[in-house]
């Protein structure tokens, strides 16, 4: 048996193993880059930039805060001027007088604040805010705390009335509105938004405020502007539905101006027939609105006829003939009571 040697396997050359040299690490303070390619000098510069940026941001925040406080103070002063008469000495002086009064009485009572503001919740709110800011700036901590509590009490008790006065300050603060008329309109508006909408009652009150011909139309216009401002405010004094109901009622009641002119003309003719007649047109129209809203009966018609026409039958008939057109005009659904705006279910 012949023995055969195994075949020779090919020998392949082996590549030599390279020696791995460790990377040189940056020595602190040498300025050489580290493993991430960032040198200590770059880190220092970045840290300094962060500090500078933070300082700039803080300065901007302080400036913005200071400007916001100044802007708020200016707006508070402007609001106070709209609420007060042109002869007033200013918000700062009013706030100091209020603080002096409360310190003398040793009691920051809400009733005293309202008395100082002539019973106006909006004025009291503005002056209290200014007085509290003065106390804070003066470092009077106890006075500041007392005024804060009084302000909270005012907001809880007269929140809607105060908000109504603030929201409508610009509408009622125009230069063509005298102080007496401004006060009357603001009081009427506060009453109108503090309860259920009563368009008839509001219109009758506006008629009663007329001192000279044409003033009712101006009052009606100013009241609509006030409602529009209140509706657009961030925090309205009443619900949007209630304010829209009042707006709709006042808008549809613009024809009352025509009714007033008709009453003036009718009463003017009747005074020639009945010299003892002393009824003025606003009072006569208010009476007619009340009668038509409740349903005018025979006895009421007879009493009114005798009162206006006098004792002579021909004068009474003349009054009834002149009254017919006015009575038909006053029978408007918008004057019969609270009404929902169009498109709303009863």
Curated annotation (Swiss-Prot):
GO cellular component: cell surface; outer membrane
Coiled-coil annotated residue ranges, if any: none
Domain of life: Bacteria
Keyword presence, Protein transport: yes
UniProt KW Lipid metabolism keyword: no
Pfam families on file: HrpJ
SS bonds (residue pairs): none
GO process annotations (BP): negative regulation of protein secretion; protein secretion by the type III secretion system; symbiont-mediated perturbation of host programmed cell death
InterPro entries tied to this protein: HrpJ-like, T3SS_LcrE, T3SS_TyeA-rel
Alphabetized UniProt keyword annotations: Hypersensitive response elicitation, Protein transport, Transport
NCBIfam families documented for this protein: LcrE, type_III_tyeA
Function as written in the Swiss-Prot or TrEMBL entry: Involved in the secretion of a proteinaceous elicitor of the hypersensitivity response in plants. Also required for pathogenicity on host plant.
Family to which the UniProt record says this protein belongs: Belongs to the HrpJ/YopN family.
Record-given protein name: Hypersensitivity response secretion protein HrpJ
Species in which this protein is naturally found: Pseudomonas syringae pv. syringae
């Amino acid at each position: 048996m012949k023995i055969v040697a195994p075949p020779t396997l090919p020998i392949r050359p082996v590549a030599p193993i390279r020696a791995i040299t460790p990377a040189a690490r940056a020595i602190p303070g040498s300025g050489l880059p580290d493993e991430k390619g960032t040198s200590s000098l770059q880190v220092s510069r970045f840290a300094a930039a962060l500090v500078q940026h933070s300082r700039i941001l803080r300065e901007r925040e302080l400036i913005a805060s200071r400007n916001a406080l100044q802007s708020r103070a200016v707006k508070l002063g402007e609001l106070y001027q709209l609420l007060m008469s042109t002869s007033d000495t200013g918000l700062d002086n009013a706030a100091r007088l209020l603080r002096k009064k409360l310190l003398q009485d040793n009691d920051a009572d809400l009733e005293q604040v309202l008395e100082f503001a002539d019973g106006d919740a909006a004025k009291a709110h503005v002056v209290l805010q200014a007085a509290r800011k003065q106390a804070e700036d003066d470092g009077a901590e106890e006075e500041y705390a007392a005024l804060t509590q009084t302000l909270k009490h005012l907001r809880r008790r007269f929140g809607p009335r105060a908000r109504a006065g603030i929201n409508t300050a610009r509408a009622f603060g125009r230069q063509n509105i005298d102080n007496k008329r401004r006060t009357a309109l603001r009081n009427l508006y506060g009453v109108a938004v503090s309860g259920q909408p009563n368009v008839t009652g509001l219109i009758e009150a506006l008629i009663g405020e007329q001192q000279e011909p044409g003033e009712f139309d101006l009052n009606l216009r100013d009241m609509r502007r006030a409602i529009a401002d209140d509706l657009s405010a961030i925090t309205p004094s009443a619900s949007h539905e209630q304010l829209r109901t009042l707006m709709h009622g006042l808008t549809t009641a613009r024809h009352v101006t025509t009714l007033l002119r008709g009453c003036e003309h009718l009463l003017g003719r009747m005074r020639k027939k009945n010299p003892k007649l002393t009824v003025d047109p606003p009072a006569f129209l208010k009476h007619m609105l009340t009668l038509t809203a409740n349903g005018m009966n025979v006895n009421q018609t007879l009493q009114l006829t005798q009162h206006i026409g006098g004792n002579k039958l021909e004068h009474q008939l003349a009054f009834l003939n002149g009254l017919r057109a006015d009575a038909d005009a006053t029978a408007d659904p918008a004057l019969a009571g609270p009404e929902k705006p169009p498109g709303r279910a009863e």
